[in-house]
Each structure stands twice: as C-alpha cells, then as structure tokens.
Amino acid sequence: MIYLPDGVQDFLPEEYKFKRKIEEKFREVFIKFGYQEIMPPTFEYNDNFSVLFDENNLYRFFDKKGNILALRPDVTTQIARIVSTKLKGSFPLKLCYVANVYRYDDPQVGKMREFTQAGIELIGTNHEESDAEIIAVAIEALKSIGIEDFKVDVGQVEFFKRVVEDLELQNEEINLLREFLQQKNQSAIEEFINDKGIRGKKAKFLSELPLLFGGEEVLKRAKELYDTPKLGETIDYLERVYRILKDFGMEEYISFDLGMVQNLNYYTGIIFRCFVKGIGYAICTGGRYDGLLGIFGEHIPATGFAISVERSMLALQKQKKDIIDKSWRVLIKYKENLRSNAYKKATLLRGEGKIVEMYSYEKAKHVDENSFDEIIDMEE
C-alpha cells in the first residue's frame, strides 16, 4: 500500500475546483479593496521563522551548503520581512496573498500540516479605521463565498497582558493561564486564583474575564470590573472600532470576547476570530501586530488576517452551499477525415466559454456521454 504522510491530502478534480473557486472569490474581494497580491517563497532560512515559532513546529531541512531552511509556517512573517527590506517608502501599504503554509502541529479538523491561507496585511497605519477595515474585509470575503450565520469575535491582547503584568506571573504560569482562557475553563481559573492567592479586584477581573463575551454591553462591564486608565483607553478604542463597523452596517456580525488569547505571539492590539454557526473552530483569525516588522529592522505598525481555505470549504459543505459555476460540457464525435473541422468547431465553442472534448467515433465508444450537456456528431 502507498500512503501519504500525516497532515497532507490530495484534492481530486471536483474538490480542487471547489477550493480554487473559494480562493478566486477571496482574491477578488481583496483586490477590490485595493490590496495587491504578493507571493513569498515557500521556504526561507530557518532563523527568519524560529524567532517567532517553536522549531519543533517547523518543517526544517538542510541545503547542500549546510544552511538550515524551513518551509513557511506563516505568510505574515514573510510579508513583514519583505516590507522591511524591499518595500520601504510609501505607506499605507496594502498586500494580499493566497498561499500554502506548513506547520508540524497535530492535524485538526479542516487544518492539516499543509494548508492554504488567504489573507491581507495593511501596513503603516495604527488607527481604528484600519482595524475596522481589516475586519470589514474579512466579513466581505466570507459573504462573497456564501457563508451564512457567522460571527466575528473581537478581543484585545491588552486584557490578558494587563492581567499577566499585574500578577507578575512566570512563563509557565502564563502559558497555563492562557490555556485556561482559551478553553474558557472557569473552574480551572478559580483554582488558579486560589493557588496563587490572588485577591480583590484582580481576582474578580480574572474570574470574570472568560465570561466577558457578547454584545457591546461587555465593554461597559469590563470598565466596571477593572477601571484603570490603560484598560479604559483600550476599551474606548474597541468602542470606536465598533462604531465604524456599525457605520458599515456590519454590527450584526460583531461580538466581543475580552478573554480571547491568540497562539501567535506577535499580536499587540486588537485581535479577532471568525466562527460559523455549528462549527467549533475559527475559520479566520487576525489582529494588530505593531512589533513584528521591528524584528526585521523597521518599526512600522500593521494589521491583518488570514482565512483558512480548507475550513471555509467545510463550512460551505456543512451549510450545503455550492459555489461552482456549472460550465456547459460539449462532446464532439467525428470521423477521422473531419478531424480538422471538429477542432475548428471545438475552438469556436471554447471561445464561448464551453468545455469541449473531442473524440473520433472509434474512441468515443469508451466515453460516458451522460456527463455531457450537448453532443455534436460530425459525420460529413
């Protein structure tokens, strides 16, 4: 038996047609918002990625010179490098991509070790209009492929960061608390509070942080729980972003989750995830990463998102949506002496956007005629 490695898959013709259509629709939305497509290399020097990603999650290999290379685990990091080294100058800069990425993680539903991301990066701005635009483009992209009943959960890394700073936690404790918040494990958080002897407002805020999700009333509740100037500014910023999205008519898609934490460490501000009703995993993640370009020598603010194409496919399949345009299929059967005429006819029909296959009568005996919408006989 011949097997594939864990975490990769074949896309058969109909599946791949479905996947390509989704990618095309995402790309079309991005371009209409002014984003220019870019394509970084599939692999780079390992050091370009290991500064942000655990090397155990990278696909690494040596070239013939002994250099350690790695398949890209993320496109945003590559774009940060490109902007810092090759696109310095006029900002804001709008870039988009559709590309495969590679992570040696445990395979999940709709997320293999090789998977496709479609995303945008808005570089050189650090105001609420840019964060609102990023979220708006994500919403428009999902709508463009016909996904319904989805929500964009909006958070801010400042909430988790503030808790960690105030409690002076060690790295191991930070990772443990991050895991509890991701799982919204209330009992584990309560146990954590008791074990660490956390008291007063800090204990109250940490206890309620995983519960701070819902509509804009969540922001008011957060201010009441932990009224500090820094968090007050953070909440005010979220309110301004929300007002812009309301002006765009997108409030029905927005909810807040102030206990949200992201796995990627480069996020510095607003973060968000898109969930489809009935599907328990995010199909899109994004946020602000003002410090990432600094790793490559340029301190430039930026924000963006990535949509999982495979998870978008699963969401559409679950909602029983078919976005493939049904092309008219034509079979031309011809006598050997009429091959030239048959080819001219096929060329004419292909120019009209039809799919045309042509076979001599002898070869056509083995063709499934039921798979065609039209059959043309060229006998004379």
Curated annotation (Swiss-Prot):
One of its GO terms (molecular function) is catalytic activity, acting on a protein. Keywords: Amino-acid biosynthesis, Cytoplasm, Histidine biosynthesis. Pathway: Amino-acid biosynthesis; L-histidine biosynthesis; L-histidine from 5-phospho-alpha-D-ribose 1-diphosphate: step 1/9. PROSITE patterns: AA_TRNA_LIGASE_II. GO terms for cellular component: cytoplasm. The keyword Zinc does not apply. It is found in: Cytoplasm. Required for the first step of histidine biosynthesis. May allow the feedback regulation of ATP phosphoribosyltransferase activity by histidine. Belongs to the class-II aminoacyl-tRNA synthetase family. HisZ subfamily. This function is generally fulfilled by the C-terminal part of HisG, which is missing in some bacteria such as this one. This is ATP phosphoribosyltransferase regulatory subunit. It comes from Thermoanaerobacter sp. (strain X514). The lineage of its organism: Bacteria, Bacillati, Bacillota, Clostridia, Thermoanaerobacterales.
